[in-house]
A protein has these predicted regions:
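Residue-level signal for glycine
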Residues: 305-307
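Extended active-site neighborhood of metal-dependent phosphoesterases/phosphodiesterases
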Residues: 63, 82-202, 219, 223-239, ...
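N-terminal active-site segment of His-dependent metallophosphoesterases
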Residues: 27-93, 182, 186-187, 194, ...
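Hydrophobic residues embedded in beta-strands of well-ordered beta-sheets
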Residues: 296-298
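N-terminal secretory signal peptides and thylakoid transit peptides that target proteins
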Residues: 1-19
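Short acidic, glycine-rich surface-loop motifs adjacent to enzyme active sites
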Residues: 199-215
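Residue-level marker for buried hydrophobic side chains located in beta-strands
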Residues: 41-43, 74-76, 113, 206, ...
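Active-site flanking residues adjacent to catalytic metal/cofactor-binding acidic residues
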Residues: 45-46, 78-79, 161, 208, ...
Length: 317
């Protein structure tokens, strides 16, 4: 039977992905992408549901991945607690959605976290203050930067953003608009410009909850495209990681690689291919990353431990 154009494109996409993943599935790419002088870390978002809707399954696979390649830290890209954030540092969700879910020994490393739109429904300051209760939880401020050494000669600067004030609020979030409106976007934008300008690290990675571009349910974020993307281009940022859409995606805007890791729980299957899409799948899962001096290896893994996609981001001059 003759294939339609859509069937042909889908077949070609699957075949191309299978070819690309073949060396990784055999273990050769993992070994090549994980030299002794490298930084391993995990990224997950949109997760805090009292262990429900695949959260426990994803947590289990994160632990197994970190057993294989020990993660120095974990990045949470926001929407840490559903549906309405946390009320205080004593909120039961700290236990039911975090401490009692990510229990693997390999996950007892620093978690560097940012806020998502659902976190804005609750007490944002409590997420900053919780570090005093649990040393592995880290959110020094609503936006911040930090540096990690890759090896003796190379470092990476991470820039953690507070993107909810940059987003178009959903109808059910309008009651929380005061919390969002109180944030000074111009100040955050000036901070990011200055921080990127001051960075001398060969690797620059930006983390936000909301996407630049996305084929997922929420789609693109116009403010980020207009105001943040030009800064990423200007200062040679290699990668931007986000959540918000409950799926796994790799998109590209010029030389900047955009990764969605919003599959921490309750996946959404609505996903379309855009002009920027390189990969996308509506499923639960997370990202395992390995950063060496010359390349960043990104692996997308689902809640059953299946490797769905892998790619390498080269260092930019």
């Amino acid at each position: 039977m003759k294939q339609t154009r859509r069937q042909f494109v889908r077949t070609l996409f699957v075949a191309t992905q299978a070819t690309a993943l073949a060396p990784l599935l055999s273990g050769r790419l993992l070994a090549a992408g994980n030299p002794a002088a490298a930084l391993n870390f995990l990224l997950v978002g949109d997760w805090g549901r009292n262990g429900e809707k695949d959260q426990v399954a994803v947590a289990k696979q994160m632990g197994l991945a970190a057993d294989q390649n020990p993660a120095k830290f974990i990045i949470s890209v926001g929407d840490n607690f559903y549906e309405d954030g946390v009320k205080s540092v004593d909120d039961p969700q700290w236990q039911s959605s975090f401490e009692q879910v990510y229990t693997a020994a390999s996950l007892q490393v620093p978690w560097w976290s940012i806020l998502g739109n659902h976190d804005y429904h609750g007490n944002c300051d409590a997420q900053i203050e919780y570090h005093l209760r649990s040393p592995r939880w880290n959110m020094p401020a609503r936006y911040y930067t930090r540096t990690e050494q890759i090896d003796a000669a190379n470092a990476v600067d991470f820039f953690y953003l507070d993107t909810t004030p940059m987003s178009k609020l959903d109808a059910d979030e309008l009651m929380f608009h005061g919390n969002v409106k109180s944030q000074d976007l111009a100040r955050q934008l000036a901070w990011l410009d200055a921080a990127l300008a001051a960075s001398t690290a060969p690797w620059k990675i930006v983390v936000g909850h909301h996407p630049v571009y996305s084929g997922g349910q929420h789609g693109d974020t116009p403010y980020i495209i207009k105001h943040i993307l030009p800064l990423l281009e200007k200062y040679g940022v290699q990668a931007y990681f986000n959540g918000h859409d409950h799926d796994l995606q790799h998109l590209q805007a010029g030389k900047i690689n955009l990764f969605c890791t919003g599959g921490g729980s309750k996946p959404r299957t609505q996903l379309k291919t855009t002009a920027h899409t390189k990969f996308g799948l509506g499923c639960s899962g997370f990202i395992a990353a390995t950063l060496a001096a010359e390349q960043l290896d990104v692996r997308m893994i689902d809640d059953q431990g299946k490797l769905l996609y892998a790619t390498t981001v080269p260092r930019r001059a």
